[in-house]
């Protein structure tokens, strides 16, 4: 997501990144900011890269992955500085550089996923309550991908429905997976019923 200003008014714009010049449409306006969606990238940022995540255009987990990694770290530092200044009213404070990693993938040890009708397991699509199915995530540990696959296989085999948020029907609502450095895994399945009934 990019941030731009027009006559001092701030817009948060989906589909662009730091340094892009874009044509965008206004999706919504609030009192102090607006939300926009990129229609066309007029000039690509010199910091733009192709995201390695196949879901990055739909989910928020990898929204910075179309930005060079050193710029991601710089941007995160600036976000902290700006929040301290704007929210905390702290002007004169040293914010050290964000510590990066050699391989910025497969590092996250906790994944939270929505489960929906049709055995969908994934994230909400950006700005909606519609589930975007995910089979693998480049920021989660590989073990998380295995758990997602096993839960889906279980649901299909035993005809256990995912939760339909619109009709408030179905059983499995959420999946939470935590992993440790020594490869232990904790799996939490959130249901709408006290017992997991299956045939």
What name fits each language-model region?
Residues 1-199:
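Accessory RNA-recognition modules of RNA-modification enzymes
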């Amino acid at each position: 997501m990019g941030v731009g200003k027009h006559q001092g008014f701030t817009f948060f714009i989906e589909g662009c990144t730091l340094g892009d010049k874009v044509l965008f449409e206004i999706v919504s306006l609030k009192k102090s900011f607006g939300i926009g969606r990129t229609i066309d990238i007029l000039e690509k940022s010199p910091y733009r890269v192709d995201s390695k995540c196949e879901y990055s255009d739909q989910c928020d987990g990898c929204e910075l992955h179309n930005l060079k990694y050193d710029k991601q770290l710089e941007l995160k530092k600036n976000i902290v500085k700006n929040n301290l200044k704007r929210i905390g009213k702290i002007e004169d404070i040293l914010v050290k550089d964000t510590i990066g990693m050699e391989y910025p993938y497969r590092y996250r040890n906790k994944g939270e996923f929505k489960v929906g009708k049709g055995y969908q397991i994934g994230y909400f699509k950006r700005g909606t309550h519609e589930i975007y199915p995910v089979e693998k995530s480049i920021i989660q540990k590989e073990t998380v991908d295995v758990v997602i696959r096993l839960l889906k296989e279980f649901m299909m085999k035993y005809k256990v429905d995912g939760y339909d948020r619109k009709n408030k029907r179905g059983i499995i609502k959420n999946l939470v997976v935590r992993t440790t450095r020594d490869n232990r895994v904790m799996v939490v399945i959130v249901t709408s019923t006290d017992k997991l009934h299956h045939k």
